[in-house]
Amino acid sequence: MTRILTLGDSLKRFYAIIGHRAPSSGKLNLNDLPGSGRMDVLVRAINSALFLSHGIRNDSLITLHLQGGEGPDRRILFDGTTLAGVRPDERSIAGQIKAIMKLPIPPVGRFQEITQGIFHSGGDITDTIESWTKDNVEINILDADGTNIAEKNIVEKIGIILSDDLPFNEYEKIFSIHMTKYHWEENGYRDILA
């Protein structure tokens, strides 16, 4: 089944997670997620953005950017409004990513639904930012040197860009120069996600 993903007004929290070394295609070793481009860090971020203690956060859209390995970049979207069949553990999320990595990468901007609430497309972070800008999402950067995010006023549509264990590369720094930078403190993370 293939359909084009359109962003609805009910989505409020947008996350872009950049995996600099995470392969966009090929094999993913579920027994060695840290050795697979730090996939462990990426799936933990997805898990935190998607799941509550009692269910799925239905107001979140997470875009995982796989930028490592051979071939073009891939974006995988997890849509909390329709997501089903994914458990809140690293191995389950990584298993979904592994299955997608075996598929050909669709053209940039055309998201193909793989399973309920999970889509993939070609493209990189600039494509995601362009989409968010069109949807009037306020874009912010998660940065250790930024302001505490708990001090931020929450807007209707907030977008947060975060990196894996690597800092933003020079290209990513250029596009993010005018974006507000925040960091999480102990309770800041829960406050923004609650």
Regions found by a protein language model. Give the residues of each.
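Post-transcriptional modification and biogenesis factors for structured RNAs
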Residues: 1-194
